[in-house]
Amino acid sequence: MNSDISTRIKKSLCSGTVLLATVLLFSSGSAVAQEEKRSTSAETLLDEITVSARRREERLLDQPMSIAAITGEQMQVQGIYSIDQASKFVPNVTLTSDDRANNTRVVIRGIGGGFPDPVFVFGSGMYVDGHYVPTSLGGYMSTVDIERIELLRGPQGTLFGKNVTGGLVNIISKKPQPEFDSSVLVRLAEDGQQDIRGMVNVPFSDTVFGRFSAASEQFDGYYYNQNLGVDSGGKDSKSFRAAIRYQPNANWTIDASGLVSRKRDDNLGGQCQNNLRDAPQWGGGDGNLERRLYVGAREDFFAICDADVAAGDFVHSSEKVTFSDVDEEIFQLGVQWDSDGPLGSLDNATIDFKASYRDMQYNYFADRDYSRWPIDAIGTGSTDGQNNETFGFELLFEADVNDRLRFTVGANYFDETAFNGSNTCYDLFVGNGASGQVTCQDTGLHFELVPDNPNSVFIDPTQAADLWPNAPRINGGGPGPFGGEVSVWNKSTGIFGHMTYDFNEDWTLDVGARWTEDDREFHNFEFASTGCDVGLDPQNMCAYTLETSLFQVNDSGFFNQEAATFSEVTPMLSLTRNLASGDMLQSGMFYFLYSEGFLTGGFNTEVNANIPEGGPNLSYGPENVKNYEVGFKGQFMDGRVQVMADVFFMDYTDQQKSFELQNNDGIYGTEDPVELVTNIASSSISGVELELRGSFWDGGFVSFDLGYIKNEYDDYSYEDPANPGTIIDRTQFLINDFTPDMSINLAVEHEFQLSGGASITPRLNMNWQDEYEWAAETGDWPKDAPKSGCHQDAYTTVDARVTYRPSKGDWQMAAFGGNITDERYIEFCEADRNVWLWLSLIHI
């Protein structure tokens, strides 16, 4: 195998320079508020945290499960301004992005991922105020007015349901309060970073309170497009949230909120390199440049790549202006009734009803070859792109039966509708009985690829100037396009229960179970087009005139539709040994946890349903994970030290993995062989997680986080469909889990008291990541293979922050630098299906 690569490099805000942030906090000026503003960051980081991981509010240190929680105040102290930045402080959690802007990748304990196609789901999920976010699209939220984020590791199938086999990220917003409060944050940084956030909390009466927040966050980007002469990779995000709380008495609380956000970002920058010679043969794959264009086109392309690399890490020559636009609205209603005393034979009873709605519109255009040639681009144009609409309902009832027994029961319903495109071509095609020719203009997903020359093997080199003009190409509309539409409908129902029983002061038992039924349906239509006749936007791509027939679809596209129902029961059990306080120990526990989770089944999009051979491969079943975990949680030295640690083993079965199917006759489209997905593998995941927080000396604070994970296939073998009796074994291949084997994060700070009562607190944070083979993303890199061009050696980043707090006044100022040693490391690297392998580096 060849380890040659092409490169996409990414850095974060700081580039080794010092940035400046100013936080102005205005409050009602009560004595309590003043005391909180003057507290040290160490006290903030050791504050008791209340979480709702078991669907009721409990202390973090009382939860018999692996969970990390970070409050809004703690995020401010640690310099966390976006949800994805939290993963640096949480072992075995990876929050990053895919190769396209605003496409999130959530991976917990080696399970998860992210891809924009609405058909695909992944094993680690995200919730926003109780609403499940089923798609990876939308980008990570900023931390504007966030109460806390909870990161739950391990299967959460009992209380949260499907698609959280690795774990989940639970985001909780701040609720309106009865006292006036307000805050403003201004954050300035290099590369045009300008963030402004504001919040005001207003009590309208003794029973009605309102909370309003807004944010504008801008960033110019750190890539330079030397072909177009512009910066790229920039971001422009604006959001507004309004929340109202009505508390007519001690029994009732009614919350209503709405969040509207608009993101107008560039797509992620990148770089190609003259390193790879054996990329997959698809689109403009290695060798296809010369077959489809002219003798020498391949070397000309790599010469351009070399010129970009020589110009610097953050230089590329894309011929297109790319974008990633996301419009998002979330509306939520919560009604809670509290018995405020006995309810018949029960006590402390609570009924909680939640309803939520989310609408997300996504349009993008990405140049995947990063060169001045129109080799490979993908996008939705600027009209009907991808729309994801979801709504959900949940009803919870919890109560105490007696001093020893507590329970929670509930039911939920979730509905998702997702469209990639307007469905015009699909509807016309079906309306004509899938046989007559259809002419339509669609606005779904489009690809622009290297064209085929139908008349000869090689194009005359003298035509090269006409095919690949050297002048910048701002207009899209590259050659050889094809496109597709995808429609997805999901309906999910769940019934669940959880019980906690205290045998005595020392021992506690928790048991629970959930039944989930998931109804899924999808339509997929992929087609070739005959031209690019109507310009949608002169800076992006154009609309294609589509002439679709049954022969054309079978020959070079796909038409399929399928529906399936998947149901599972996911139990859990934990046994907790509570420890008595002693000379050093303030509180503590040991626990054993068994839990299960399942990832719902799915569909192979690139199969023609109207061909008999395609039927058996249209769908595949759920994945299942069983988790065995032993952990410890405790407080020492009068609460000045906190320790949370666990060891886990997860049995991962029925994994949805790809297998190769020979396609000489083109039944499965134009690729040969074609990769399809089925339940074909199993693996074992084991690891350790350790989190230590301590104020070991007056004014000082230390945090230490360690994560270790071992993720290997137990079996990944299957019979070769083209050669019965021949077994293809991939068991010794690496797993693309986007997680290093080991990670360590160490932070140290000390508060120095200045004359007059002011203070200054320097903070140093070191993060070490073990080596990682990103070539595993392609799914075909053996463990014993030489290091690929996508291999990431172990590396260390160092962040610094200095915070000034005055003796009086509700404000503070911080100067900070990220990656002050200017370390370069890979954010993402994969084999593109065209000409090369590309990677993304970060240099924060």
Regions found by a protein language model. Give the residues of each.
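N-terminal Sec signal peptide and the immediately downstream disordered periplasmic leader
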Residues: 1-78, 84-90, 201, 331, ...
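Conserved C-terminal beta-signal and adjacent last beta-strands/turns
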Residues: 7, 16, 20, 49, ...
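Outer-membrane beta-barrel translocator/receptor signature
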Residues: 121-123, 135, 144-147, 153, ...
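Solvent-exposed loop segments that connect transmembrane elements
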Residues: 222-231, 268-317, 367-383, 423-485, ...
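Structural signature of Gram-negative outer-membrane beta-barrels, strongest in the C-terminal barrel
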Residues: 245-247, 397-400, 406, 410-414, ...
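Membrane-embedded beta-barrel scaffold of Gram-negative outer-membrane proteins
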Residues: 332-338, 343, 348-368, 578-606, ...
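Gram-negative outer-membrane beta-barrel transporters
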Residues: 398-403, 407-408, 412, 505-509, ...
